């Protein structure tokens, strides 16, 4: 019994929004059971557009609900401030990291 209780306390639920192809509202679903949201654009030659504003709105929802947020990658076609960036695969992760928008609340939960 104590093992089962301890194991349940360690389970983390993540929501993966990748590829993020449109603006979404996860606010109604973010709770104590959801501890992380991961978002990113699509890779590959047929990749569809991901917009930075969608990423930021998802991040804001996480901020308001104290849920960890990880911007994993921009994807191949990324729109920021109205400009379309065509990014080679090797830059998807580093460009997302440079945005500096990840959130980490786990120690507070």
What residues fall within each predicted segment?
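Single conserved hydrophobic/aromatic residue that forms the stacking wall/gate
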Residues: 1-11
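Canonical radical SAM enzyme core domain
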Residues: 5, 15-26
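Conserved active-site beta-strand-loop modules that form the wall/rim of enzyme catalytic pockets
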Residues: 12-14, 35-36
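Auxiliary Fe-S-binding modules of radical SAM enzymes
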Residues: 21, 25-109
């Amino acid at each position: 019994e104590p093992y089962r209780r301890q194991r349940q306390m360690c389970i983390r639920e993540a929501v993966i929004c990748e590829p993020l192809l449109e603006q979404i509202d996860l606010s109604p679903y973010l709770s104590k059971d959801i501890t992380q949201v991961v978002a990113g654009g699509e890779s590959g030659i047929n990749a569809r557009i991901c917009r930075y504003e969608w990423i930021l709105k998802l991040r804001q929802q996480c901020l308001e609900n104290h849920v960890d947020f990880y911007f994993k990658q921009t994807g191949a076609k990324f729109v920021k401030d109205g400009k379309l960036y065509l990014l080679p695969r090797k830059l998807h992760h580093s460009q997302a990291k440079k945005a500096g928008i990840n959130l980490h609340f786990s120690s507070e939960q």
